[in-house]
Amino acid sequence: MWVSIFNLKSSGLNHFCTRTKAFRYFWCRTFSLASLSENNSRFQTDSSRLPYSGSRYYHSSSKHFGEDFVSILKNIDVPRDCVETIRNVLVKHNWIQKYESGFSTELDQYTVIRILDDLFEETLDASIVLYFFRWSELWIGVEHSSRSISRMIHILVSGNMNYRAVDMLLCLVKKCSGEERSLCLVMKDLFETRIDRRVLETVFSILIDCCIRERKVNMALKLTYKVDQFGIFPSRGVCISLLKEILRVHGLELAREFVEHMLSRGRHLNAAVLSLFIRKYCSDGYFDKGWELLMGMKHYGIRPDIVAFTVFIDKLCKAGFLKEATSVLFKLKLFGISQDSVSVSSVIDGFCKVGKPEEAIKLIHSFRLRPNIFVYSSFLSNICSTGDMLRASTIFQEIFELGLLPDCVCYTTMIDGYCNLGRTDKAFQYFGALLKSGNPPSLTTSTILIGACSRFGSISDAESVFRNMKTEGLKLDVVTYNNLMHGYGKTHQLNKVFELIDEMRSAGISPDVATYNILIHSMVVRGYIDEANEIISELIRRGFVPSTLAFTDVIGGFSKRGDFQEAFILWFYMADLRMKPDVVTCSALLHGYCKAQRMEKAIVLFNKLLDAGLKPDVVLYNTLIHGYCSVGDIEKACELIGLMVQRGMLPNESTHHALVLGLEGKRFVNSETHASMLLEEIIVAKWHLTSGG
């Protein structure tokens, strides 16, 4: 199938060329680029235009390319030497021929490959070839064939532009969607358009590495064995990356088989390979096997390095074995290895995370370690978790005094600390400082701020941060949406809750349990209890089991309005779903009975719950006590207070307030004093009873 880039004969391309404004834009934009050798970064791979591996042929098309070409060359802002070089090579090899008022040639995939070869042979500059490759695709108006792309990839690698080859191959892998047949076609085209064996080995290694990057580990493994049929094996770095993924996805057995295959193909074991196995053993909890392999490295002729020991130390710390990690750290010198900041920082971070900063400080002094950002981040995390933000801000300032610059993690830690205390004003001060520092806020940073603003009533600030996240191109997740949704729910903006759910679905984000909890709670608070109940029913019909919290909200809503029949239907529905109501669920139902002053029903339910193994808390007892006091049954209320004390729970202000209300209903004088005396008598009596006095 033929394409003319100069003679306007094809009706298909005729239509394309009639869109003159769009066409001139692409044309001028292409030729107004700066020198390719200076600005290669401008040729970023556009995944929306990169050819699919299945595009093995051009569509039939042609285009006039005569005097317009000359006039554009005269008027566009482009380095003359680059354009002249391409033009001269095309003329030299007769790709541009005199044809009436212009020049003419015909292009198909084979012709494109030959032109690419001629350009590279004459210039030895892969960037110039890439320039023509990109321009020709825009000019033709159809995607390049898989073979043309394959040849371009070989030229890029030959011209030391591997990073551009990575862009192209990565896009091909994405377009193939992991289909073995499509990737095999790509591999076939790469093999058939090879330049020399050295380049082919590099290209196949890049292809396999791209599969690994896309987490297509099975495909990467299959391609490895397929290229082995050509006598080619991936580079050492790619083998290590693939081995790491095999260990992550498939485990030790397949990883051992792959290592044996590596050895049979001339790849040798090294510390990096064995460190991956040490990491896997430790991640699975087999620290004894990890240590055995670490100590047995010498049997393979390999000396353990600081990286291998750091892997082992780090895994010990993350598993909570800080004493053992510290011991290994101090023994490193026995193996002729000096501790570095990474190995020491791992243990310091471990101590900080378990709330032992004093042990971390001892290590810093022992190894005379100059604190780095990672160490400071660990200390800040520990201090902020205690709520001591004054001390945390002092530590934060020390970072600057040492000549270090806080990273996004440090700023986010401070922001989170202030948000937990409700100090959103201080949190925004650090957020502003983060923006001024040039560090872009992470998804976590902004999500924390939105959550705090939603909790503490600054919904407009939460919306502002949310809009800024979308402007900055951050990929929002379900937690971000849930945090803002929570704020809308608290401010009774139910319409915006539904709008956010629609936006989530449009963005391809599936609502989770927390999303539905927020939605149902918001509806119950606004009084839409029946509608909330319908949502629960619909979720169950779709196979989604709502949480206990969602059931509790609706049960509480039904109970408050006195609709105990519907409340109990949901209660028994929970049992059918093998969900056990918790104390909060029971409190919601009992609160409804107490509010309706149906205390005989309330106490029967309470006793049944006790028999079923429920462990009531102070809130549940106070609910019943308040109910009995409201109907004037002070004696029964005192009996429940005694039972509560007997179970190890002391009365609180809510208990005292319930008694006061009950005594006032009985027209007692000095009801507050009398209530205090009653509580004291009950506590003393129960104390004597339990102590045997």
Swiss-Prot record:
PPR repeats lie at residues 200-234, 235-269, 270-304, 305-339, 340-370, 372-406, 407-441, 442-476, 477-511, 512-546, 547-581, 582-616, 617-651. Pfam families: PPR, PPR_2. Disulfide bonds: none annotated. InterPro entries: Pentatricopeptide_rpt, TPR-like_helical_dom_sf. The keyword DNA repair does not apply. Signal peptide: none annotated. Keywords: Repeat. Belongs to the PPR family. P subfamily. This is Pentatricopeptide repeat-containing protein At2g19280. The lineage of its organism: Eukaryota, Viridiplantae, Streptophyta, Embryophyta, Tracheophyta.
